[in-house]
A protein has these predicted regions:
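Catalytic active-site module of serine/aspartate enzymes centered on a nucleophile-bearing elbow/loop
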Residues: 315-346
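N-terminal secretory signal peptides and thylakoid transit peptides that target proteins
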Residues: 1-14
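Active-site loop/oxyanion-hole signature of alpha/beta-hydrolase fold enzymes
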Residues: 114-160
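Alpha/beta-hydrolase
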Residues: 200-202, 208-288, 307
């Protein structure tokens, strides 16, 4: 069974008591502003730098991509000189699991932009497998940058978003003020080495069962699901229980077709079109100020995050000692303390 289906099923009952304050991800439709003089004791500010003329959209903007053929959803939150565009993971997931960001970045005076990649969440979802490739998504990020008018901005990429972040820095570095690569190694061989080591920690009988199921490509079987959900994911994906509602929303809204084509049907194997991606030998080309983030219990080796930082001339790293792949949730205070320190200094 693919990750979306068996994870989403597992979180349905768990999310009821989750982290409070998670923001809604829906794109609200703004009502027309009242006249400046006020009606019924309500006064609405006149247009100015912070309140532009026209219909208010709560920061939501649909940006044309693929040469204007489709549109992707973005949402601006906060205002400040440091602007951060967020690239979610997956491939095929949504911005929702990153919603912890808005509890920290805007309050620090940082302007942030959510963005659902094409085929994901609130964005257009064409049924066209030719669109689900790394080069096409790379071009999409540049289209989004231009559409939002971002220049001298920080690009944040988590997991698959980190792959996109590295690629963007290698191709469009001149637009960047800074780069954050969170919980993503610079190549798939390092990722597979780590996931294999994690599987080796299973009891021998369970490991043998898992390997037999993988040999048969029985990823949809209840047995495979049980091992993933009970033995692996609670340890390396998110270590808090229940999982935050924002994480559950992402999993329920994920686009499996994209995930299966680019990653494959298992989180612990790589059979999709990203399987040969390696950029270790080009990290030295990334000159912009960069932060890499890892976690002790992540499915990505934290030592790889530190190694990546050493291979870039203007990079630093930090490791969450109690966190996993979603360390913005399961080691939240430490994660944002160090992320904000970087963003304020970049």
């Amino acid at each position: 069974m693919d990750r979306r289906n068996f994870l989403a099923t597992s979180v349905v009952s768990a999310v009821a008591g989750t982290v409070a304050g998670t923001a809604s991800s829906g794109a609200a439709v703004a009502a027309p502003a009242r006249p400046a003089g006020g009606v019924d004791g309500i006064t609405v500010t006149q247009p100015d730098g912070l309140n532009p003329p026209g219909i208010r959209t709560a920061g939501v903007r649909m940006v044309p991509v693929v040469g204007g053929k489709y549109k992707v959803w973005t949402k601006k939150i906060g205002s400040g000189p440091v602007k951060v565009l967020l690239l979610h993971g997956g491939p095929g997931f949504t911005h929702e699991y990153l919603e912890a960001m808005e509890s920290f970045l805007p309050q620090a005076g940082i302007e942030m932009y959510y963005y659902d990649q094409l085929g994901c969440g609130n964005s257009d979802q064409p049924d066209d497998p030719s669109l689900w490739t790394l080069p096409r998504y790379l071009e999409e990020v540049e289209e989004v940058r231009r559409g939002l008018g971002l220049e001298n901005f920080v690009l944040y990429g988590h997991s698959w978003g980190g792959i996109l972040g590295i690629e963007y820095a290698l191709h469009h570095q001149r637009h960047l003020r800074g780069l954050v690569i969170s919980n993503m190694a610079a190549g798939m061989q390092a990722y597979l080495k780590r996931t294999n080591a994690i599987k080796q920690q299973l009891p021998p009988a369970l490991l043998a069962q898992l390997e037999a199921l993988e040999a048969k490509e029985a990823y949809d079987s209840p047995e495979y699901e049980k091992i993933m959900m009970e033995e692996l994911y609670p340890k390396v994906i998110c270590r808090i229980q229940p999982w935050p509602d924002a994480v559950g929303q992402t999993l329920r809204h994920a686009n499996n077709k994209i995930y299966n084509q680019m990653q494959g049907k298992s989180e612990f194997l790589m059979t999709g079109n990203l399987k040969d991606w390696e950029r270790w030998d080009r990290l030295h080309e990334i000159k912009v100020k960069t932060l890499t983030i890892g976690a002790k219990y992540d499915e990505m080796d934290p030592e790889d995050m530190q190694k990546m930082a050493k291979m870039m001339p203007n990079a630093s790293s930090f490791i969450c000692q109690n966190g996993s792949h979603l360390s913005m949730w399961d080691e939240q205070a430490f994660y944002f303390q160090h992320l904000l320190r970087f963003l304020k200094a970049v």
